[in-house]
From Swiss-Prot:
Participates in Wnt signaling. Plays a complex role in regulating the basal catalytic activity of the alpha subunit. Phosphorylated by alpha subunit. GO terms for molecular function: protein kinase regulator activity. This is Casein kinase II subunit beta. Residues 213-235 are annotated as: Disordered. PROSITE patterns: CK2_BETA.
Length: 235
Protein backbone atom coordinates (compact mmCIF):
# COMPACT_ATOMS: atom_id res chain seq x y z
CA UNK A 1 0.00 0.00 0.00
CA UNK A 2 1.42 3.42 -0.92
CA UNK A 3 1.66 6.24 1.61
CA UNK A 4 -1.10 8.15 -0.24
CA UNK A 5 -3.47 5.24 0.38
CA UNK A 6 -2.69 4.87 4.06
CA UNK A 7 -5.54 5.62 6.42
CA UNK A 8 -4.89 7.79 9.46
CA UNK A 9 -5.36 6.34 12.93
CA UNK A 10 -8.31 8.68 13.57
CA UNK A 11 -10.10 7.60 10.38
CA UNK A 12 -9.37 3.95 11.15
CA UNK A 13 -10.69 4.27 14.71
CA UNK A 14 -13.89 6.07 13.72
CA UNK A 15 -14.51 3.46 11.03
CA UNK A 16 -14.46 0.54 13.45
CA UNK A 17 -17.72 -1.30 14.04
CA UNK A 18 -19.27 0.16 17.18
CA UNK A 19 -17.57 3.55 16.82
CA UNK A 20 -20.21 5.07 14.54
CA UNK A 21 -21.10 7.70 17.16
CA UNK A 22 -17.62 9.28 16.95
CA UNK A 23 -16.69 12.05 14.55
CA UNK A 24 -13.17 12.64 13.26
CA UNK A 25 -11.38 15.20 15.42
CA UNK A 26 -9.32 17.66 13.39
CA UNK A 27 -5.58 17.01 13.65
CA UNK A 28 -4.93 20.71 14.33
CA UNK A 29 -7.16 20.47 17.39
CA UNK A 30 -5.25 17.45 18.71
CA UNK A 31 -1.88 19.11 18.13
CA UNK A 32 -2.87 22.17 20.19
CA UNK A 33 -1.56 21.38 23.68
CA UNK A 34 -4.06 23.77 25.26
CA UNK A 35 -6.91 21.50 24.17
CA UNK A 36 -5.28 18.54 25.93
CA UNK A 37 -4.74 20.23 29.29
CA UNK A 38 -4.99 17.75 32.16
CA UNK A 39 -5.42 14.65 30.01
CA UNK A 40 -1.87 13.47 30.71
CA UNK A 41 -2.98 12.89 34.31
CA UNK A 42 -5.95 10.75 33.27
CA UNK A 43 -4.44 8.58 30.55
CA UNK A 44 -1.62 6.06 31.13
CA UNK A 45 1.15 5.97 28.51
CA UNK A 46 -0.03 9.42 27.46
CA UNK A 47 2.94 10.34 25.28
CA UNK A 48 2.91 7.08 23.33
CA UNK A 49 -0.88 7.20 22.99
CA UNK A 50 -0.76 10.72 21.56
CA UNK A 51 1.95 9.74 19.10
CA UNK A 52 -0.20 6.82 17.94
CA UNK A 53 -3.22 9.08 17.38
CA UNK A 54 -1.09 11.52 15.38
CA UNK A 55 0.46 8.67 13.33
CA UNK A 56 3.97 9.39 14.55
CA UNK A 57 6.55 6.61 14.35
CA UNK A 58 6.47 4.43 17.48
CA UNK A 59 9.58 3.78 19.51
CA UNK A 60 11.56 0.62 18.67
CA UNK A 61 10.91 -0.92 22.09
CA UNK A 62 7.16 -0.51 21.55
CA UNK A 63 7.27 -2.39 18.25
CA UNK A 64 9.24 -5.23 19.85
CA UNK A 65 6.86 -5.57 22.83
CA UNK A 66 3.35 -6.77 21.85
CA UNK A 67 2.00 -6.36 25.40
CA UNK A 68 3.21 -2.77 25.60
CA UNK A 69 1.77 -2.13 22.15
CA UNK A 70 -1.67 -3.37 23.27
CA UNK A 71 -1.55 -1.15 26.34
CA UNK A 72 -0.67 1.84 24.19
CA UNK A 73 -3.54 1.03 21.83
CA UNK A 74 -5.99 1.01 24.74
CA UNK A 75 -4.54 4.26 26.04
CA UNK A 76 -4.87 5.83 22.58
CA UNK A 77 -8.56 4.89 22.43
CA UNK A 78 -9.15 6.40 25.86
CA UNK A 79 -7.20 9.56 25.02
CA UNK A 80 -9.03 10.02 21.74
CA UNK A 81 -12.37 9.56 23.51
CA UNK A 82 -11.58 12.26 26.06
CA UNK A 83 -10.31 14.60 23.34
CA UNK A 84 -13.50 13.86 21.38
CA UNK A 85 -15.68 14.87 24.35
CA UNK A 86 -14.02 18.30 24.33
CA UNK A 87 -13.95 18.67 20.57
CA UNK A 88 -17.70 18.16 20.06
CA UNK A 89 -18.34 21.20 22.26
CA UNK A 90 -16.53 23.42 19.73
CA UNK A 91 -18.20 24.99 16.70
CA UNK A 92 -16.39 22.66 14.30
CA UNK A 93 -17.18 19.58 16.37
CA UNK A 94 -20.83 20.54 16.73
CA UNK A 95 -21.09 21.04 12.96
CA UNK A 96 -19.74 17.54 12.33
CA UNK A 97 -22.12 16.00 14.86
CA UNK A 98 -25.09 17.86 13.38
CA UNK A 99 -24.39 16.15 10.06
CA UNK A 100 -24.52 12.76 11.76
CA UNK A 101 -27.63 13.80 13.73
CA UNK A 102 -29.48 14.77 10.56
CA UNK A 103 -28.68 11.46 8.88
CA UNK A 104 -29.82 9.48 11.93
CA UNK A 105 -26.41 8.01 12.74
CA UNK A 106 -27.24 8.05 16.46
CA UNK A 107 -30.54 6.23 16.08
CA UNK A 108 -34.15 7.31 16.46
CA UNK A 109 -36.35 7.63 19.53
CA UNK A 110 -38.31 4.43 20.25
CA UNK A 111 -41.20 6.42 21.75
CA UNK A 112 -44.21 6.16 19.43
CA UNK A 113 -45.32 9.77 19.74
CA UNK A 114 -41.82 11.09 19.00
CA UNK A 115 -42.31 9.80 15.44
CA UNK A 116 -38.75 8.51 14.86
CA UNK A 117 -37.09 11.66 16.14
CA UNK A 118 -33.29 11.50 15.60
CA UNK A 119 -31.31 11.29 18.83
CA UNK A 120 -27.91 12.42 20.10
CA UNK A 121 -25.24 10.60 22.15
CA UNK A 122 -25.01 11.49 25.82
CA UNK A 123 -22.87 10.48 28.76
CA UNK A 124 -24.36 10.05 32.23
CA UNK A 125 -20.94 10.82 33.71
CA UNK A 126 -17.86 12.75 32.62
CA UNK A 127 -15.60 10.26 34.40
CA UNK A 128 -14.36 7.35 32.24
CA UNK A 129 -15.51 3.90 33.28
CA UNK A 130 -18.63 4.98 35.18
CA UNK A 131 -21.36 4.64 32.53
CA UNK A 132 -21.74 3.59 28.92
CA UNK A 133 -23.05 5.97 26.28
CA UNK A 134 -26.80 6.61 26.08
CA UNK A 135 -28.94 8.31 23.45
CA UNK A 136 -30.90 11.47 24.20
CA UNK A 137 -34.16 12.40 22.51
CA UNK A 138 -34.58 16.20 22.33
CA UNK A 139 -38.30 15.79 21.65
CA UNK A 140 -39.43 13.90 24.76
CA UNK A 141 -36.29 14.95 26.68
CA UNK A 142 -35.54 11.43 27.85
CA UNK A 143 -32.56 9.07 27.73
CA UNK A 144 -32.43 5.58 26.21
CA UNK A 145 -30.01 2.70 25.83
CA UNK A 146 -28.72 2.51 22.22
CA UNK A 147 -30.67 0.01 20.15
CA UNK A 148 -27.62 -1.76 18.74
CA UNK A 149 -25.62 -3.86 21.20
CA UNK A 150 -22.38 -2.84 19.49
CA UNK A 151 -22.76 0.59 21.13
CA UNK A 152 -23.30 -0.82 24.61
CA UNK A 153 -19.55 -0.88 25.33
CA UNK A 154 -18.77 2.72 24.34
CA UNK A 155 -17.86 4.90 27.31
CA UNK A 156 -20.29 7.76 27.88
CA UNK A 157 -17.47 10.04 29.06
CA UNK A 158 -16.28 10.20 25.45
CA UNK A 159 -19.36 12.32 24.66
CA UNK A 160 -19.89 14.08 27.98
CA UNK A 161 -22.96 15.04 29.94
CA UNK A 162 -23.52 18.39 28.26
CA UNK A 163 -23.08 17.80 24.53
CA UNK A 164 -26.76 17.75 23.37
CA UNK A 165 -27.55 20.83 25.45
CA UNK A 166 -24.58 22.74 24.04
CA UNK A 167 -25.65 21.84 20.51
CA UNK A 168 -29.14 23.27 20.99
CA UNK A 169 -27.82 26.34 22.80
CA UNK A 170 -25.62 27.12 19.80
CA UNK A 171 -28.18 26.01 17.19
CA UNK A 172 -31.70 26.40 18.65
CA UNK A 173 -33.14 25.96 15.16
CA UNK A 174 -32.41 22.24 15.40
CA UNK A 175 -34.36 21.78 18.63
CA UNK A 176 -37.63 19.94 17.84
CA UNK A 177 -40.98 20.93 19.31
CA UNK A 178 -42.29 18.89 22.22
CA UNK A 179 -44.73 16.13 21.18
CA UNK A 180 -48.38 17.18 21.22
CA UNK A 181 -49.73 13.67 21.76
CA UNK A 182 -49.55 11.88 25.08
CA UNK A 183 -50.56 8.29 25.68
CA UNK A 184 -53.74 7.99 27.79
CA UNK A 185 -54.51 4.60 29.41
CA UNK A 186 -58.08 3.37 28.87
CA UNK A 187 -60.21 0.50 30.13
CA UNK A 188 -63.39 -0.45 28.25
CA UNK A 189 -63.08 2.81 26.38
CA UNK A 190 -62.95 5.00 29.49
CA UNK A 191 -59.90 7.02 30.51
CA UNK A 192 -58.24 5.83 33.70
CA UNK A 193 -57.85 8.75 36.08
CA UNK A 194 -54.27 9.51 37.07
CA UNK A 195 -55.19 9.10 40.75
CA UNK A 196 -56.64 5.62 40.28
CA UNK A 197 -53.30 3.81 40.65
CA UNK A 198 -52.30 5.98 43.59
CA UNK A 199 -55.55 5.20 45.43
CA UNK A 200 -55.11 1.50 44.68
CA UNK A 201 -51.56 1.47 46.05
CA UNK A 202 -52.63 3.40 49.14
CA UNK A 203 -55.44 0.94 49.82
CA UNK A 204 -53.05 -2.00 49.47
CA UNK A 205 -50.58 -0.37 51.86
CA UNK A 206 -53.29 0.19 54.48
CA UNK A 207 -54.50 -3.41 54.32
CA UNK A 208 -52.48 -5.54 56.73
CA UNK A 209 -53.43 -9.16 57.24
CA UNK A 210 -52.96 -10.44 60.84
CA UNK A 211 -49.66 -12.29 61.18
CA UNK A 212 -51.23 -15.49 62.56
CA UNK A 213 -53.84 -15.49 59.84
CA UNK A 214 -51.05 -15.31 57.27
CA UNK A 215 -49.52 -18.47 58.77
CA UNK A 216 -52.84 -20.32 58.78
CA UNK A 217 -53.21 -20.02 62.57
CA UNK A 218 -56.20 -18.56 64.40
CA UNK A 219 -55.70 -15.19 66.08
CA UNK A 220 -54.44 -15.26 69.64
CA UNK A 221 -57.78 -14.25 71.17
CA UNK A 222 -59.51 -17.13 69.36
CA UNK A 223 -57.26 -19.92 70.67
CA UNK A 224 -59.24 -22.69 72.47
CA UNK A 225 -59.00 -22.48 76.23
CA UNK A 226 -57.52 -25.36 78.24
CA UNK A 227 -60.43 -27.22 79.85
CA UNK A 228 -59.41 -29.44 82.73
CA UNK A 229 -62.47 -31.65 82.21
CA UNK A 230 -61.45 -32.53 78.71
CA UNK A 231 -57.90 -33.54 79.54
CA UNK A 232 -57.67 -37.34 80.03
CA UNK A 233 -56.54 -38.27 83.51
CA UNK A 234 -53.63 -40.58 84.01
CA UNK A 235 -54.53 -43.78 85.83
Amino acid sequence: MSSSEEVSWVTWFCGLRGNEFFCEVDEDYIQDKFNLTGLNEQVPNYRQALDMILDLEPEDELEDNPLQSDMTEQAAEMLYGLIHARYILTNRGIAQMIEKYQTGDFGHCPRVYCESQPMLPLGLSDIPGEAMVKTYCPKCIDVYTPKSSRHHHTDGAYFGTGFPHMLFMVHPEYRPKRPTNQFVPRLYGFKIHSLAYQIQLQAAANFKMPLRAQRGQPPKDEEPENNADTVPKRL
